[in-house]
Amino acid sequence: MKVELAQLAGRDKDTAYNLERALAAIAACPADTQLIVFPETHLMGFPTAATVAQIAEPVDGPTVSAVQAAARERNLAVVIGMAENDNGRFYNTTLLITPEGIALKYRKTHLWASDRGVFEAGDRYATCLWNGVRVGLLICYDIEFPESARALAQLGAELLIVTNGNMDPYGPTHRTAIMARAQENQAFALMVNRVEAGDDGLMFAGGSALVDPLGTVLFEAGREEGRFSVELDFAQLELARKDYRYLDDQRLRLPGEVVEHASGVRELLIP
């Protein structure tokens, strides 16, 4: 599988600029690209409690519709973050958009300090079957909690995709976390982070990465903007799970109702 990691700078509360950059990155993908991944809340940047009502959009709004049109035109899938407005309730949301539409929606379940008072926490984990691979989404701070990735693994995830908005001085924390989450769940993990300055003096740390099911870093970006092409060989899943399978051997499983949808989406509801 050919994947493009779009490690971009963004502008907080400037949807038009961020969308333009996303559409340009999608248009520039090589013809054999199957998936492009952007950072956390890339489309809107990070709103504040005072601005979120003006900045956030529904998932069927004009900004997501423009991304859907680009995905159809290029015949590829897009994972991208947004500030979601669901009838006046606001979420830090990541979407998996295919040429057919929105295949998966995930709302951040672990809110970082600056998320609180702006967004509500999501209430479930979810995976979907895309391109023959079961995919799960996480957002930034989620990966510092092993249970988040394990929830996706219990739902069958073979590929963990993390949209990231991690800032200095916490870059090394997420490097360690993404390696651990891949290794302990014997799954591929992709993480795409923002770079350069944001509001309130934040400096985003970059370090987008691809990690294999053994926890080995196959690719790691620096701190500069860039679009990076990587390739995933899912035959490595079988090799990683040949001698032992953590999910089979674990003694304690995460609680919560599992919901299977006709679309292939599989959800674990947080009790």
PLM regions: where:
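Extreme N-terminal starter segment of soluble prokaryotic enzymes
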Residues: M1-L5
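Short polar catalytic/cofactor-binding loops
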Residues: Q7-K13
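Cys-nucleophile CN-hydrolase/nitrilase-fold catalytic domain and related Cys-dependent amidase chemistry
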Residues: T15, L23-P99, K105, M167-A187
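Short hydrophobic-aromatic micro-motifs
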Residues: I36-V37, R134-I139, I161-V162, L190
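CN hydrolase (nitrilase-like) catalytic-core segments centered on the catalytic cysteine
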Residues: P62-A77, E144-F228
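Conserved beta-strand and immediately adjacent loop positions that scaffold enzyme active sites
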Residues: V79, T93, R124, G207-S208
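Active-site catalytic loop in hydrolytic enzyme cores
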Residues: N85-E158, M167-T176, A180, L239, ...
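C-terminal beta-strand edge segments of enzyme domains
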Residues: T127-L129, R194-P271
